[in-house]
Amino acid sequence: MLTSHFPLPFAGHRLHIVDFDASSFHEHDLLWLPHHDRLRSAGRKRKAEHLAGRIAAVHALREVGVRAVPGIGDKRQPLWPDGLFGSISHCASTALAVISRQRVGVDIEKIMSQHTATELAPSIIDSDERQILQASSLPFPLALTLAFSAKESVYKAFSDRVTLPGFDSAKITSLNATHISLHLLPAFAAMMAERTVRTEWFQRGNSVITLVSAITRFPHDRSAPASILSAIPR
């Protein structure tokens, strides 16, 4: 499959972005993935997206001296090496990944049309959040896409600690040209209730990318070895 990769410093991390041409995908492209058998029943588009995401993840891991391909967990989540946290996302013909010494979540979404934003808004935000989005200087479709993406990034950062929370479990409290703040409610995770999480964002073409990096650690989180931590951008 034809791909192009470039790293992009953002919010104290380095995003590894992979643009790919799904039409050039061939089944044998998957053979270098140790878990390729688990993708046998997936559709062609899904296989291409998965491959691009893992290519981005491999680039991210190599940056910290780790040569590995993240496997697939029981909940289809990426499995990262001990002591490292990571996140993968893809949309249309772009995939990206990020590695960190602390919990991290990244998401990329195509900016909604006006019609789609109007239709989906009630399922993503409440009336208070709508006022915040409308008070920003951003067009509503862009603002709503950011709200959706920010909540996705927060969920990814803590996916192993929460049980499929709804969009109403994290509320937008502020939105400006560079970041979004979200207030976590008990429905998100009791141990994280009433915390505020800051999500950084930027626009790339007709898509937005959001990233949350959280210093929160839990009893079973393992710290990365010093040799690895020293190589990870702060």
UniProtKB/Swiss-Prot annotation:
Q: What is its main location?
A: membrane
- What's the catalysed reaction? apo-[aryl-carrier protein] + CoA = holo-[aryl-carrier protein] + adenosine 3',5'-bisphosphate + H(+); apo-[peptidyl-carrier protein] + CoA = holo-[peptidyl-carrier protein] + adenosine 3',5'-bisphosphate + H(+)
Does this entry carry the keyword Repeat? no
**Which SUPFAM superfamilies does UniProt cross-reference here?**
4'-phosphopantetheinyl transferase
Q: Which cofactor does it need?
A: Mg(2+)
What positions does the entry give for Mg(2+) binding? D107, E109, E152
Q: What processes does the entry annotate via GO biological process terms?
A: enterobactin biosynthetic process
Pfam families membership: 4PPT_N (PF17837), ACPS (PF01648)
* Keywords (A to Z) from UniProt: Enterobactin biosynthesis, Magnesium, Membrane, Metal-binding, Transferase
Q: What is its EC number?
A: 2.7.8.-
**Top-level EC class, please?**
transferase
What are the disulphide bonds in this sequence?
none
Give the Gene Ontology MF terms in alphabetical order: holo-[acyl-carrier-protein] synthase activity; magnesium ion binding
- Gene Ontology CC terms, in alphabetical order: enterobactin synthetase complex; plasma membrane
Where in or outside the cell? Membrane
Q: Tell me the route in metabolism or biology where this protein functions.
A: Siderophore biosynthesis; enterobactin biosynthesis
- Can you state the subunit structure given in the record? EntB, EntD, EntE, and EntF form a multienzyme complex called enterobactin synthase.
Note the NCBIfam families from the entry: PRK10251.1
Summarize the protein's role.
Answer: Involved in the biosynthesis of the siderophore enterobactin (enterochelin), which is a macrocyclic trimeric lactone of N-(2,3-dihydroxybenzoyl)-serine. The serine trilactone serves as a scaffolding for the three catechol functionalities that provide hexadentate coordination for the tightly ligated iron(2+) atoms.
Q: Which family does it belong to?
A: Belongs to the P-Pant transferase superfamily. EntD family.
Q: What is this protein's record name?
A: Enterobactin synthase component D
Source organism of this protein record: Salmonella typhi
